[in-house]
């Protein structure tokens, strides 16, 4: 389906936090007057959304996709503009066998990305740091504990690489540290 759209694709994957992150990104797009369409592992399939776009072209459209490891098993040419990795933990090992196989399946999402793409990843996850190294896409790390990355957090704010506050922690309505991590992504 990605072959048939020129609209940017943001693909979100990870063991936890995918749905929340997709919803946050969709709201961010809407606030910038970009129509976002959520699809993938939730709601109407991405392919059906693209078919609708072909029949009724729209401008200022972005696809925000929730991607599971299962969906990556059959993908040949998928190439998002932005790939987001929330975290990786030993899930679905009954299907993938080992953690290495699970990580490799998650990496299928970025194998076709070039240097015009972005990989946003949780730099608190050592497996993700190793997994994304060497990709042509630009790496955009975020962290709940490390500073000096593209996005980090302190007791008061989500900060940019330059240390400038981007958003106050108090302004985030979602409770829990895991949701702060989702916001960073």
Language-model segments: residues:
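Phosphate-binding loop of NTP-binding sites
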Residues: 1-123, 127-136
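Adenine nucleotide phosphate-binding catalytic loops in nucleotide-utilizing enzymes
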Residues: 96-100, 137-185
């Amino acid at each position: 389906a990605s072959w048939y759209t020129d609209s940017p694709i943001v693909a979100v994957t990870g063991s936890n936090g995918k749905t929340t992150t997709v919803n946050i990104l969709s709201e961010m797009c809407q606030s910038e007057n970009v129509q976002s369409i959520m699809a993938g592992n939730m709601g109407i399939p991405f392919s059906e959304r693209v078919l609708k776009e072909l029949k009724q072209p729209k401008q200022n459209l972005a696809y925000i996709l929730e991607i599971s490891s299962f969906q990556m098993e059959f993908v040949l040419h998928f190439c998002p503009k932005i790939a987001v990795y929330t975290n990786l933990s030993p899930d679905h090992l009954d299907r993938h066998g080992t953690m290495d196989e699970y990580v490799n399946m998650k990496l299928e999402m970025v194998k076709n990305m070039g240097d015009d793409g972005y990989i946003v990843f949780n730099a608190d996850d050592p497996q993700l740091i190793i997994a994304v190294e060497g990709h042509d896409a630009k790496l955009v790390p975020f962290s709940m504990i490390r500073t000096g990355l593209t996005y980090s957090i302190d007791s008061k704010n989500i900060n940019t690489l330059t240390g400038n506050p981007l958003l106050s922690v108090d302004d985030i309505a979602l409770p829990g540290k895991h949701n702060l991590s989702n916001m960073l992504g």
